[in-house]
Regions:
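Phosphate- and other anionic-substrate recognition elements at nucleic-acid/protein interfaces
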Residues: 1-134
Length: 134
C-alpha cells in the first residue's frame, strides 16, 4: 500500500510517497510538468512494489496534465477537493505550510481514506472545450 501525495503548483509539483505508519518510501521531491518529467514520474511510481494510489488536489487547471499523464500510464489517480485536504488533520497546533508538508499531508489523507477513493476519469473533449470557454 503506497500513497502518493502530490501538491500541485504552476509548472511544478511536490511529490511524497508514504506507506502506513508514516513509513517514507521516497522523500519529497519536485517534478516539473513537462511530458518527459511526468512520464518519468509515472514510471518511477509504477516501479514501487505494492498497490499505489496517487492523490492530488484539483486546483484550477494545473492538476490536469499531471492527472491525465499518470492516469493514462495505468496508475490509480484521484483528484480531490482542496477543502477536504485543508480540513483533514486541521486540528494540529502547528501550522506548517510548505510544499513538502502539503504533499505528505495529501499522502496521509490517501492512506486514511484508501477504501473510499474513486479513480480519476479524464474529461471528454466536449466537456473540456466547454470548461475552457469560461
Amino acid at each position: 500500500m503506497n500513497a502518493v501525495g502530490i501538491d500541485i503548483s504552476r509548472g511544478k509539483s511536490m511529490v511524497a510517497v508514504l506507506r502506513p505508519f508514516g513509513e517514507i518510501v521516497l522523500p519529497p521531491f519536485t517534478v516539473g510538468h513537462s511530458n518527459a518529467e511526468l512520464n518519468a514520474l509515472a514510471e518511477q511510481l509504477k516501479s514501487i512494489e505494492g498497490e499505489t494510489r496517487v492523490v492530488m488536489e484539483h486546483t484550477g487547471r494545473y492538476y490536469e496534465p499531471v492527472a491525465n499523464t499518470l492516469h493514462n500510464s495505468g496508475l490509480f489517480v484521484r483528484a480531490v477537493n482542496p477543502l477536504l485536504i485543508k480540513e483533514y488533520g486541521g486540528n494540529s497546533l502547528r501550522k506548517v505550510k510548505t510544499d513538502k508538508a502539503d504533499a505528505q499531508k495529501i499522502a496521509r489523507y490517501a492512506l486514511d481514506n484508501w477504501a473510499d477513493l474513486r479513480d480519476y476519469t479524464p474529461m471528454d473533449t466536449i466537456r473540456y472545450d466547454l470548461k475552457t470557454l469560461n
